[in-house]
Amino acid sequence: LLPHMADLAKDHVLVALLAEQDYRAASFLDQRLLGERVGREWRLWDALPDLGQAPRPDFIFHIGHVGSTLASRLIAEASDTLPLREPMLLRTLAQVAERIDRPESVWSPDLYRQRLAQTLGWLGRGFHPGQRAIVKASSVITAIADDLTGTDARAMFLYVPLPRYIETILAGDA
């Protein structure tokens, strides 16, 4: 089960039923994932189990187009790692974190920390004992990297020098 996305106004989470192969095959865990064959159901956030004691996932952070999706695929193929490429729920958490200290914030800082711990527990689960999960975060998620990794998580950050990055962006589609 993947906690796919949140409806903050209703305090619901869309849970998608995925097999391990679905995670491996998905380029990204975004809206394109929700085809007709994927079972899904909206659930109250508080009705979902708290897996805060589950292992935290490892992370790949990146800025721009630097091969992070390829790195995620290679790690998953070379090991028994479960790849989670750009889960949408993390994007929602980053948006909440951006406004957490402002009066218009939808969550209090305490609720943000609680929901973050729940989300990390959900994303850290594997399909069998000992299987690690690795999240390839989207670029905007890098803003909450400290919140996601804590003091004991494993993470890598991918980037390219600015001149090479500019060349790549200006070159357009290959």
Model-inferred region functions:
Residues L1-Q118:
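PAPS-dependent sulfotransferase catalytic core
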Residues R56-I60, H128-V135, A153-A155:
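Generic beta-sheet signal
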Residues I60-G64, R85-E86, V135-I141, L158-V160:
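Short His-Asn-centered micro-motif
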Residues T69, R73, A117, G121, ...:
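A broad, structural surface signal
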Residues A76, H128, G150:
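Short conserved AdoMet
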Residues T92-S108, S139-A174:
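PAPS-dependent sulfotransferase catalytic domain
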Residues L120, G124-D147:
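Glycine-rich phosphate-binding loop used to anchor ATP phosphates in small-molecule kinases
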